[in-house]
Amino acid sequence: MIHFILIQNRQGKTRLSKWYTPYEDVEKRKLSHEIHKIVNSRETKFTNFVEFRTHRIVYRRYAGLFFSVCVDPTDNELFCLEAIHLFVEVLDAYFGNVCELDLVFNFYKVYAIIDEVFLAGELMEPSKHVILQRMEFLDNLP
């Protein structure tokens, strides 16, 4: 199960976060800061999986953004990496070469995409084509 999703830039600013497990605001900020310190300091030759407290962080870097997912230690890490990649592919197809500013200024659309891909901390829709069709439908609503 996915506990939370964080999208952070290299400077540590959280550009987007989605929490599937309830945390206090102070704890959310602390987790975001700790995770950024961990993933930002790792070399590219290391694996994209990190043990973190009682969970596991699976992350992937795209350009200047870190996409981090906190999962149970029993979850399949490669599946999580592919879920992150699917999410980024959908963002890229939807926005056309997505960048950090797209996430900042169109955050409500990014949250809609997250809600189409993930439901209650689980991958809901594995088809990029279906997700993009749903987003097109939402865009055409009056």
From Swiss-Prot:
GO terms for molecular function: clathrin adaptor activity. It is found in: Cell membrane; Membrane, Coated pit. GO terms for cellular component: AP-2 adaptor complex; clathrin coat of coated pit; intracellular membrane-bounded organelle. Keywords: Cell membrane, Coated pit, Endocytosis, Membrane, Protein transport, Transport. It holds the Pfam family Clat_adaptor_s. The keyword Transferase does not apply. It is a peripheral membrane protein. GO terms for biological process: clathrin-dependent endocytosis; protein transport; vesicle-mediated transport. The keyword Cell cycle does not apply. Component of the adaptor complexes which link clathrin to receptors in coated vesicles. Clathrin-associated protein complexes are believed to interact with the cytoplasmic tails of membrane proteins, leading to their selection and concentration. Belongs to the adaptor complexes small subunit family. Adaptor protein complex 2 (AP-2) is a heterotetramer composed of two large adaptins (alpha-type and beta-type subunits), a medium adaptin (mu-type subunit AP50) and a small adaptin (sigma-type subunit AP17). This is AP-2 complex subunit sigma. It comes from Dictyostelium discoideum (Social amoeba). The gene is ap2s1.
